[in-house]
Regions:
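Conserved Switch II/interswitch segment of TRAFAC-class P-loop GTPases
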Residues: 89-111, 119, 129-130, 142-147
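Conserved nucleotide-binding/hydrolysis micro-motifs of P-loop NTPases
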Residues: 22, 76-77, 100-102, 141-145, ...
């Protein structure tokens, strides 16, 4: 996608944390907010009493003259419409793979759904050419005793025609590699942006900040 630019010259990018329910998306976002000092404003969350995201979590992070609006999606299967709404206009994706072996099918379901919705953006017809929207994977919960091997995750990505996807081994509750993954995704946003500028693409002005609209009853 293409970022927008505010009147003061600030570039605005949108990052989305994707993945199955309870995979660590909100925990990772909370770590960025509470521990890393990158947040500008409050962490907004729409969740149920158990901590499951009902629509999205949102955080604004600012680095120099670049702003990143970071969203998580609701991971439960019934919230497909909400995920599709949050996904619109995304500049980069971070897929949180739940390393718990018992969650294998949920990971596969979530990845397949993402490719159905956004495959034309995150896949490239030529592996030598990066896709329009960068995607990285956080293999989360690496502190658990029974975890899926990284090689198996790589096999899934290869079968999905994403063999060059970068994988970070993370533990969201302790922050292990969370900042590294976030910074990498943010950097990829900026790099893609300047690649597009070289090709002559224009940056649209930023509209007033809006959030995804919740579905009606």
């Amino acid at each position: 996608m293409c970022p927008s630019r505010r009147a003061d010259g600030t570039l605005v990018f949108k990052l989305v944390f994707w993945g199955p329910s309870m995979g660590g998306k909100t925990t990772a976002l909370a770590w960025v907010y509470e521990k890393e000092g990158l947040a500008s404003g409050q962490l907004q969350s729409i969740s149920d009493p158990t901590g499951r995201t009902l629509f999205f979590d949102r955080l604004v992070a600012k680095v120099s003259n670049v702003v990143f609006q970071v969203y998580t999606v609701a991971g439960q299967r019934r919230h497909k419409f909400q995920r599709q709404t949050v996904l619109k206009g995304t500049d980069a994706l971070v897929f949180f793979w739940d390393s718990d072996q018992a969650q294998w099918n949920e990971n596969i379901y979530s990845l397949k759904e993402l490719l159905q919705m956004y495959g034309n953006k995150v896949l490239s017809s030529d592996i030598k050419i990066p896709p329009e929207v960068p995607l990285i994977v956080c293999a989360n919960k690496r502190d658990l005793p029974n975890i899926t091997g990284i090689d198996k995750i790589k096999d899934v990505l290869k079968a999905a025609k994403m063999p060059n996807t970068v994988i970070f081994e993370t533990v969201a509750i302790t922050g292990t590699n969370v900042k590294r993954a976030f910074v990498y995704a943010a950097r990829e946003c900026v790099l893609r942006h300047y690649q597009k500028l070289k090709s002559g693409e224009q940056v649209p002005p930023a509209s007033p900040e809006t959030e995804p609209t919740a579905p009606g009853p």
